[in-house]
């Protein structure tokens, strides 16, 4: 049984919990996966201490015992979606490894202006890391890592918007 009550940001929700100690959270737009800097004021998924070295939050259970809650992967602040956390270090390491080896399939959805023309079945571009105002940002460029992503138009309305899936 899960006796750890996660101190969630008010805009985030637990979608599911597995008894092995894995949480699936719905992370809202504008909420950080973890604090970028010590003493930062930006809202994070959990309002508890984050250990940068161990990549985990420190949360208390109902009896006052501190537990480490490991962040499995990250989502950018501007991205909403499912975020995984684990209370078991070995399991968190296995899951992180699966993400780093790209064994986990992810789909990103984007609402776009749609002009009715056919959509290319892929997006291909070079991505470059740049420092802008002291923050690392990724943007399209002439050099860098090649990004190749499948694209499909999932839904088109009779308005100017459509829903794209980036696989």
Predicted regions and their residues:
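RNA pseudouridine synthases
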Residues: 1-167
